Structures are given as structure tokens and as C-alpha cells.
């Protein structure tokens, strides 16, 4: 989830004590390879971080299973999503997962030796230490034991102890480290949220009605995915390839223009000496390449 501050009297924009602001609390699901947003779901400002998450996962997964039944799907999420009902959904639908797990006294007791060993190695070498282990663990709310990976990191600031729960196979401490390092790559999804919020103004959910703002959120997600598709295409000009959304806006869209309409066409008139015209022309040609025409394609004057 990501917090989305509000500054008016929108429906269901409520005060969240942790963030200390009035907000919406949208849930986003992204895919790391294509960097696309698979789902954006607007929620009231005070809901639990995982509210409805298992249903949203199924909204994404079930259509994929119909199209590609044998596709391997792996979910990553922080400890806010690490709930028994989420584990059950993943296991029922043959999904692998790695979720953060909140630290508690039982977990600390099982990793006392690991923490001590990390501290001793740091004292001996003066270098940061990262040690890993794995074990079976069952919380009181779980129906059965599950595999937990523990990381003990020791440096000048002290010991940093973290846990994740996974249903991936783990047969050694080295493999536990690999699984954990893969889990922390979920932080890359935060970059997607930043691009949406800062580059495409996701926070502009300023309609009064909740459903209207929900629609605006979906438009933001669709715009992001469209931009993302062009941004990573080989035919896209090098200056824009992999560029931030803010650069796309400043180079292609922030320009004075005149729109002339007639019964036969809509004409967009741009300044004669616009410095970014070559980029705009190249992207127009790229867009036209997507359009199936039965008649000759229109020329760009």
C-alpha cells in the first residue's frame, strides 16, 4: 500500500494515526520485470494495510491462470501482508511467496546464537556482518508450521534482526541468504509508487465522491503503464528511454498548443520553434505504428 494525502473533504478520506494525516490508502500490485502496475485499488484512509489484499491478488492471478495455467507466480510483500489468510490463498492457488514477518520474543529466542555469532565476528574483524539461518516456525494463529528465514546484521549501529516467511525451498544458509536478498528487491516497487505519486501526480484525487477518485486512480495507473510500455521500447528515442515520467511531461506535454476542430479532423497546432519538436515527432510516429490502418497512415506535417 501507499499513503495518498488528501487536503479536502473527499468521501472516505480519513485521518490515519501512523501517517498523521488525512488520506486515502490505495493498494498497488506491480510486476518487477516489466515494471507495470497490475492493479490499483483505492481504499479509505484508515483501513488495515492488508485489507482486501488476498482478493486483489486473486483478481490478478486467476485470469493469468486461465491464460497460462503453468505460469510460476511469486508474491513478495512486507510484514503487513504476512497474514494467515494470505498464506492460505497463495498455497491454495499454487503461488510461491515471501513475506516479511514481525519480530517477536519467540523468534528472538530461536536466533540468539545467530545474533551472538554476528556480534563476535564484528568484534573480531571490524567489518559489517550478515548471517542467515532458516527453521520451521508456527505462530499461534497459523494452522501449521512454515519456513522462516532469519537475518542478523551487525555493524556500528548494533544488531539488525529481520525475518521473512516463505514457501520456497530452503536447504542451506547460503540459499536462505539468496531467498532473503530476492525478497528485499521488492523495494524496487517503491520506485514505481514514487513515479506514480511524483511523476504522474497520483495524489490528485480531488473529486468529492469516492468512486470518482477511484476512477481517477485507475486512469493514473493506465497512463503509467502506457508510458512504461513506450519508455522501455527499443524504438523510443534514447533521450526518453528509461527516463522518469516527469521528464516525459516536460519534454512532450508541457507546451502551448492550439486545437482546431472541423467536421473531418482535429488539428493540433504547435509552436514553430518548439525545441522538443523532434522528440514529439518521433513519439507520434511510434504511436501511429501501433494503430491498424486499412487506409494509408496520416502524415505528420
Functional labels for PLM-detected ranges:
Residues 176-215, 219, 223-231:
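Short amphipathic alpha-helical "interface-anchor" segments enriched in bulky aromatics
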Residues 96-198, 283-301:
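An anionic, glycine-rich sequence signature occurring as long contiguous blocks
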Residues 33-45:
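Gly-rich Lys/Arg/Thr-decorated short loops/hinges at beta-loop-alpha junctions or inter-strand turns
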Residues 42-66:
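Active-site beta-loop-alpha junctions of metal-dependent nucleic acid enzymes
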Residues 1-28:
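Active-site-proximal, Lys/Arg-enriched surface segment
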Residues 226-301:
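A short, flexible helix-boundary coil/loop motif
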Amino acid at each position: 500500500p501507499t499513503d495518498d494525502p488528501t487536503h479536502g473533504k473527499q468521501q472516505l478520506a480519513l485521518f490515519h494515526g501512523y501517517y498523521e494525516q488525512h488520506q486515502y490508502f490505495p493498494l498497488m500490485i506491480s510486476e518487477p520485470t516489466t515494471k507495470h502496475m497490475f492493479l490499483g485499488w483505492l481504499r479509505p484512509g484508515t483501513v488495515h494495510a492488508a485489507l482486501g489484499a488476498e482478493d486483489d491478488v486473486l483478481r490478478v492471478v486467476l485470469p493469468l491462470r486461465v491464460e497460462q495455467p503453468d505460469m510460476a507466480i511469486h508474491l513478495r510483500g512486507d510484514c503487513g501482508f504476512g497474514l494467515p489468510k494470505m498464506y492460505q490463498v497463495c498455497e491454495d492457488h499454487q503461488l510461491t511467496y515471501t513475506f516479511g514477518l514481525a519480530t517477536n520474543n519467540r523468534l528472538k529466542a530461536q536466533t540468539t546464537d545467530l545474533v551472538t555469532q554476528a556480534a563476535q565476528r564484528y568484534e573480531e574483524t571490524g567489518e559489517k556482518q550478515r548471517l542467515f539461518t532458516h527453521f520451521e516456525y508456527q505462530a499461534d494463529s497459523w494452522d501449521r508450521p512454515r519456513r522462516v528465514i532469519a537475518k542478523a546484521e551487525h555493524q556500528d549501529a548494533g544488531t539488525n534482526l529481520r525475518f521473512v516467511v516463505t514457501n520456497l525451498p530452503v536447504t542451506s544458509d547460503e540459499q536462505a541468504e539468496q531467498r532473503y536478498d530476492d525478497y528485499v528487491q521488492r523495494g524496487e516497487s517503491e520506485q514505481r509508487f514514487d513515479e506514480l505519486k511524483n511523476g504522474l501526480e497520483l495524489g490528485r484525487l480531488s473529486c468529492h465522491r469516492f468512486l470518482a477518485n477511484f476512477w481517477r486512480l485507475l486512469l493514473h495507473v493506465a497512463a503509467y503503464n502506457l508510458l512504461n510500455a513506450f519508455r522501455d521500447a527499443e524504438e523510443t528515442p534514447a533521450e526518453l528511454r528509461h527516463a522518469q515520467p516527469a521528464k516525459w511531461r516536460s519534454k512532450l506535454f508541457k507546451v502551448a498548443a492550439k486545437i482546431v476542430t472541423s467536421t473531418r479532423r482535429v488539428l493540433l497546432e504547435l509552436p514553430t520553434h518548439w525545441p522538443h519538436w523532434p522528440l514529439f515527432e518521433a513519439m507520434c510516429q511510434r504511436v501511429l505504428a501501433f494503430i491498424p490502418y486499412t487506409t494509408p497512415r496520416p502524415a505528420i506535417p
